[in-house]
Design a protein with these regions (language model features):
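Detector for outer-membrane/organellar transmembrane beta-barrel domains
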Residues: 59-168
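Short, small-residue-biased leader/transition segments that mark boundaries at the very start
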Residues: 2-3
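Glycine-/small-residue-rich "gating" segment that lines the acyl/pantetheine channel
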Residues: 14
Length: 168
């Protein structure tokens, strides 16, 4: 049931390096269970390789920032027709940021696209869309393409009152 899903924090080992006071980058190993739809001749098996997310963030003097990210993941499943463990590689890229264009007003945004990354997109996480059955090859799964994004404005009227409007 989609409404009973919960977002869980994933085990992760991450290294972040500050190149300057404005530029930082991070590289991680993250264990994310893929969520996929099994076909008639495919079966879930334990995952063996962690996801590899990377991020680069540039911060501006006024509190604004721009961040680019990417993830590479290998997802395992069992092809029961050929009795083989198979790997499908997924990938994703994102661009996000906050633009502080007035003292108390900011614009935030994010866009993401990839294949096999449904667990990284909140609205479709856990819905079986990392891998889906390949309609032209029994016993095979393929990475499902997904995209998402949002844009929003925030205004601080005072220290205790803020208004936000978002579109996703």
């Amino acid at each position: 049931d989609v409404y009973k899903r919960q977002a869980l924090r994933q085990p992760q080992i991450r290294y972040t390096y500050d190149f300057t006071d404005k530029l930082e980058a991070s590289l991680a190993l993250e264990y994310v269970e893929p969520s996929y739809t099994e076909g008639e001749f495919t079966k879930y098996i334990n995952q063996r390789i962690p996801d590899i997310p990377v991020n680069v963030k540039y911060s501006f003097k006024n509190g604004s920032h721009l961040q680019a990210g990417a993830v590479l993941r290998n997802m395992y499943y069992k092809d029961e027709i050929e009795d083989k463990d198979r790997i499908v590689t997924g990938w994703g890229a994102s661009l996000s940021g906050i633009w502080q264009f007035a003292q108390n007003t900011s614009l935030c945004f994010q866009g993401v696209y990839g294949k096999g990354i449904s667990n990284y997109i909140q609205d479709i996480s856990g819905t079986g869309l990392d891998l889906v059955p390949n309609a032209t090859a029994e016993g095979k799964l393929k990475a499902f393409g997904a995209w998402g994004g949002y844009i929003g404005f925030s205004h601080n009227w005072s220290k205790v009152l803020t208004s936000n409007i978002m579109y996703s």
